[in-house]
Design a protein with these regions (language model features):
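Terminal helices and disordered tails flanking the catalytic cores of nucleotide-processing hydrolases
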Residues: 200-245
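Divalent metal-dependent catalytic cores for phosphoryl transfer on phosphate-bearing substrates
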Residues: 53-58, 67-68, 84-197
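Intrinsic-disorder/low-complexity, polar/charged segments
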Residues: 21, 159-162, 227
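Acidic/His-rich, divalent-metal-binding segments that scaffold phosphate/diphosphate chemistry
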Residues: 1-120
């Protein structure tokens, strides 16, 4: 699955290369190709490609961060087109692409692998949230003020004054809420397994384990086509769980 996320990453690079403004394009590509915090001494414990978008809330699986970034970019571009056609407003596509790509890019610095559950957890030694890290890094690299402002606004740090900030913020929210709902469906089946095994297989372990083997939407498809019980049975088989007679 990590290989699939690397394919998505290459698509992000391709989109960044389409940015017409040279300064915005260069800083976006430089950070995307080498996502490293340089304004302070800091080292990540996991890579961008393997990172979840969040340990629990949404896209909480390996590669979830890259997948979420691609979804936000795709949604934001389509929203921009809809708003331009419907309301005849001018949307800066360079900002849409750059802000979508960069909005969560340093999240992987915040997380580490969880040796107990097999999933991910927040680092206890990390002191910078991603929304502040990207603003500081862009400022340190001398990025255009309009890009810094767009990202600050879409993260809610300051009042919104740009339509591009609103579009990316909305795209981010839509994708996060949608995938969070799908995750709840899968967690419910994992909770069923915990009850069926009298707590032997707890949800905190079965949930990350099944997402190491199957994509979230492979599992969701089973639920929508066959129902919750069939999804629970599928997870039991995939994880080799033995139910007592």
């Amino acid at each position: 699955m990590i290989e699939l996320k690397k394919e998505i990453y290459e698509k992000l690079v391709s989109e960044a290369e389409k940015i017409s403004d040279e300064e915005i394009r260069n800083v976006t590509l430089n950070i995307l190709k080498e996502p490293k915090i340089t304004f302070t001494k800091a080292e990540p414990k996991i890579s961008l490609h393997e990172s979840p978008a969040a340990p629990k809330k949404h896209h909480a699986y390996p590669g979830g961060l890259v997948e979420h970034t691609w979804a936000v970019l795709t949604i934001a571009k389509n929203l921009a087109e809809i708003f331009e056609r419907t309301y005849h407003v001018k949307v800066n596509r360079d900002l849409i692409i750059a802000a979508s790509i960069l909005h969560d890019i340093f999240k992987f610095y915040q997380y580490e692998k969880d040796p107990i559950t097999g999933g991910f957890r927040p680092r206890s030694d990390w002191y910078l949230s991603h929304q502040f890290s990207i603003i500081a890094e862009l400022s340190f690299r001398g990025a255009p003020e309009i890009l810094i402002r767009c990202l600050a606004e879409m993260h809610g740090s300051v009042p919104t004054s740009m339509i591009e900030s609103e579009i990316v913020k909305f795209a981010d929210s839509v994708d996060a809420k949608f995938v969070s709902r799908i995750q709840d469906i899968i967690r419910d089946s994992c909770k069923d397994i915990e009850l069926l095994t009298d707590g032997k297989y707890i949800v905190q372990k079965t949930y990350p384990q099944i997402l190491m083997k199957k994509t979230i939407f492979e599992l969701a498809r089973i639920y929508y086509e066959k129902g919750r019980d069939k999804l629970t049975e599928f997870i039991i088989r995939e994880l080799g769980i033995k139910l007592e007679e």
